[in-house]
Regions:
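Transmembrane beta-barrel strands of outer-membrane/channel proteins
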Residues: 181-189, 240-244, 290-296, 335-341, ...
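Face-selective signature of the C-terminal outer-membrane beta-barrel domain
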Residues: 275-298, 311-478, 603-613, 617-628
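Surface-exposed extracellular loop regions of Gram-negative outer-membrane beta-barrel proteins
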Residues: 123, 298, 476, 494-544, ...
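Transmembrane beta-barrel wall of Gram-negative outer-membrane proteins
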Residues: 179-180, 213-298, 315-332, 397, ...
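N-terminal Sec signal peptide and the immediately downstream disordered periplasmic leader
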Residues: 1-60, 65-72, 131-134, 226-230, ...
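Gram-negative outer-membrane beta-barrel transporters
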Residues: 460-465, 567-576, 583-708
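Periplasmic N-terminal accessory/gating domains of Gram-negative outer-membrane beta-barrel systems
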Residues: 22, 39-156, 166, 170-172, ...
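C-terminal beta-signal and adjacent terminal beta-strands/loops
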Residues: 116, 578, 687, 695-714, ...
Length: 790
């Protein structure tokens, strides 16, 4: 039996697709075992994670967010995954170089997989209009992928509709020399982890209460994967991967106002993934790929203080794409046609939501709110056509050129639907309905045309290369003509790649948020007995954009040490936020979106690693140390994004001083300085691989909004919003993964892996409230992973 391995490499710009798609780049498992190493930090801003990189890293729930967690350009929302909710398996939000997490672009094989319906809303609260979403349209299982490339700076001109970065996932192609089937199982549970809980939260946590936070004191996670690679005919074959990731969480069914628990129930959190690619190497000139993809996510919830509030919330995405590569005499032409359906939904068990002064649930009586608000969903169908022409390299005098041109058209058919009528009201002491609102059944849509043209040229003279490019985008949603200049230069000082400098300027225009257009459609189905109405205005918005100045340095020190340094400066303009006002005459609440948001970010990282591993007694050792610093200031909450309503405030009180709001450090994703030591050990004779990450994070701050009852509130500044920062201590964490692939098994390739996250069981505070209640990161966690390849 043979095992396919792809050596870990760093790829850049236009070379990525060609290098990754080369069908002859495979080598045999029993001839040489891969030496695992930390993923290098590139100077050109493009980090490439091979399938071996994915196997090496402890990837937790197996999402793309987990894979990118240690990347120095990335910051996680430390308050999203904590000791309180470790049963959750959804992808976490990521910020790239200080940009909002909803302004990243996700792609699968080069086709957009971004959910731009309402990506900043990840609330699971029960509401008549709440449809939770996130920017990842497909919740991919990274164990099924061939590779993932993160473009965080110097992003090539073919990528657009983002402010932060681009994440491009590639599905595996078949390998004629490796017909095989692989089975995998991965698991953890609440008994295998340590939870750090504030004393003030312990009672609610142990009950498994829910509300703004869905506690998971008791859970089991079981992940199953199946993948295969099969040649069907000469030069024609298929790969496929299936996975189910499931978390079963036991929570309180109902908790009374007196804290009495009336029963417990099990709630499921499930993510299914199915990926397949048919490949036909028709000739030396033509290659065809047909890709099929599906992910489905469902989460069962209740609000434990509201009886009969059970609901299911989820996401379903599926699509197909056809790629044709044509090798011409003078160029390479790639044509892609695709269709993707991305949807989010909320489905309550009941259609009526009401509050009554006296209700009975089991043995509990008293005032309560109960019920649900029906079934509501929104979706978008994207129809994509794109083409790209790469000229062969040619010379004009002593200068070589390698230009490429491209065009893309996407038609987006977005719609929202309320599948049944629902209503909400309050029953007063007299037994009459008040605050009565009816949500009528309905469906509405909007269609958007998106056009893109781009071109770039790699110009080389001696040991200097320039990459000028320009991108044009237009859509009829906001009707803005956006021109994005892209420029990068590389100087190989001694023409031997020992000393290199990379620098450039780039502009990145963001993507549209479709919920702004769909919101008025949903609002038109709402009938308030009191006559209240809502209206949304967004039509005059500019497209938000980021300007980037970046520089990278690479220096080989001695024979085997490589040092790399990167600096990225980002300035975000025209970021979307909102303001609301009420017209009392018409009883209309008007929400107006504006371009008042702005941020400035300084990002720096420095890394040291070896060009070749150390060899000590049949053990290959690969060390790497990374220093990373990201600091942002601005008047925008990255988490709230376009739902942020504070940006109209020119001044605020910050730590007791009246200051300009845009001079205040950004509060979320605020983990400025991180230092990581990565150390991998590979013992080839036994098949043992031991990967380690030791990370130190400096003390940071949590932002608190002051109310008039807080001691730090300054009454003379009562006309201004007031904030203070509370210090959170520094932290040291150690994550490790030990894998064993017995070399004596010739017919079955068995791999057993164990992950220990936070080996030191560090108690790290990630947030605090204005009453001093702290939230902590998860403690020590064990995972077990077994796979077998036939």
């Amino acid at each position: 039996m043979k095992r396919v391995l792809i050596p870990g490499v760093i790829l850049c710009g236009a070379d990525v697709a060609q290098a990754v798609d080369d069908k002859n780049m495979y080598m045999h498992f029993f001839e040489e075992m891969t030496v695992y190493a930390p993923v290098p930090v590139p100077v050109n801003g493009n980090t490439h994670y091979t399938s071996e990189s994915i196997e090496r890293l402890p990837t937790g729930n197996g999402n793309i967010s987990d894979l990118l967690r240690t990347n120095p350009a990335v910051r996680m929302d430390s308050t999203q995954s904590t000791s309180l909710n470790q049963g959750d398996i959804r992808p976490e939000k990521i910020s790239i170089h200080g940009a909002s997490p909803y302004q990243n672009a996700y792609l699968i094989d080069g086709i957009s997989a971004t959910n731009n319906l309402n990506p900043a809303n990840e609330s699971d609260a029960s509401s008549a209009t709440n449809i939770s979403g996130m920017s990842q349209g497909y919740y991919l299982d990274v164990s099924l992928l061939d590779n993932v490339t993160l473009y965080d700076s110097f992003v090539p001109v073919e990528f657009g509709r983002f402010n932060g970065g681009v994440i491009d996932a590639k599905i595996k192609r078949f390998n004629a020399d490796d017909s095989s089937v692989k089975l995998g199982y991965r698991t953890t549970r609440s008994d295998w982890l340590t939870s750090h809980i504030d004393e003030n939260n312990k009672s609610a946590f142990n009950q498994g209460s829910s509300g703004s936070t869905y506690y998971s004191p008791d859970f089991k996670k079981n992940f199953y994967t199946l993948s295969f690679n099969q040649e069907l005919a000469d030069n024609f074959g298929v790969t496929a991967g299936l996975s189910r990731r499931q978390s079963d969480i036991t929570r309180a069914d109902y908790v009374s106002n007196d804290g009495i628990v009336a029963g417990r129930a099990q709630y499921k959190n499930v993510i299914d993934t199915a990926l397949s690619k048919f490949t036909w190497f028709a000739s030396d000139r033509f290659t065809h790929d047909l890709t099929l993809k599906y992910t489905g996510s469902s989460r069962d919830y209740n609000t434990s203080t509201f009886p009969q509030s059970d609901r299911e919330m989820g996401n379903k995405s599926y699509g197909l794409a056809w790629d044709m590569d044509t090798q011409l005499a003078w160029a390479k032409l790639r044509t892609t046609v695709g269709w993707d359906h991305i949807s989010d939904y909320t489905r309550h068990d009941h259609d009526t939501w009401y509050t009554e002064l006296s209700c009975t649930y089991g043995d509990i009586t008293g005032r309560c709110t109960r019920g649900g608000l029906g079934h509501i969903s929104q979706a978008v169908d994207n129809y994509t056509f794109k083409t790209r022409l790469d000229w062969q390299k040619f010379a004009v005098g002593n200068v070589s050129h390698q230009p490429y041109f491209g065009a893309e058209y996407i038609y987006s058919d977005a719609w929202t639907e309320r599948h049944n009528q629902s209503e909400s009201y309050v029953i007063n002491a007299a037994g009459k309905k008040t605050n009565h609102t009816i949500y009528h059944k309905g469906k509405g849509s909007l269609g958007i045309d998106n056009y893109t043209l781009y071109m770039a040229d790699r110009i080389s003279w001696r040991n200097v290369s320039l990459m000028p490019g320009v991108r044009y985008d237009y859509d009829n949603y906001l009707s803005n003509h956006n021109i994005s200049p892209r420029f990068m230069t590389e100087w190989d000082i001694f023409a031997d790649q020992t000393s290199m400098i990379t620098a450039g300027y780039n502009r990145y225009y963001g993507g549209n948020i479709l919920d702004m257009g769909l919101r008025d459609i949903r609002n038109s189905w709402t009938e308030s007995v009191s006559g209240n109405k809502t209206l949304t205005r967004y039509q005059d918005l500019k497209t938000p954009y980021n300007d980037e100045l970046a520089m990278g340095l690479q220096q080989k020190i001695g024979k085997n040490v490589i040092a790399r340094a990167n600096y990225v400066y980002r300035e975000a303009h025209d970021q979307i936020s909102k303001s609301s006002r009420t017209d009392s005459a018409t009883k209309t609440t008007i929400t107006e979106y504006n371009n008042d948001g702005k941020t400035k970010t300084h990002s720096f990282n420095l890394s040291f690693e070896l060009a070749e591993p150390l060899h000590i007694r049949q053990v290959d050792i690969n060390p790497q140390i990374v220093f990373s610093y990201i600091k942002s200031k601005g008047n925008l909450s990255l988490n709230n994004g376009y739902e942020e309503s504070n940006t109209g405030d020119n001044q605020v009180v910050y730590n007791g001083n009246l200051v300009s709001y845009d001079s205040v450090p950004v509060a979320d994703f605020n983990n400025p300085l991180k230092i990581s030591l990565n150390m991998d050990f590979t013992h080839q004779p036994s098949g043992l691989v031991w990967a380690n990450t030791l990370a130190w994070q400096e003390a940071r701050k949590a932002r608190i909004i002051l109310g008039k009852t807080n001691a730090q509130y300054i009454s003379e500044y009562s006309d201004y919003k007031q904030y203070v920062d509370e210090k959170l201590d520094s932290s040291l964490t150690w994550d490790t993964r030990l894998s064993w692939t017995p070399q004596f098994l010739q017919q079955q390739n068995l791999t057993i892996s164990a992950d220990i996250l936070n080996v030191l069981d560090s108690k790290t505070a990630v947030d605090t409230t204005n009453t001093g209640v702290a939230t902590y990161a998860s403690g020590r966690t064990f995972w077990l992973d077994v796979s077998m390849k036939f």
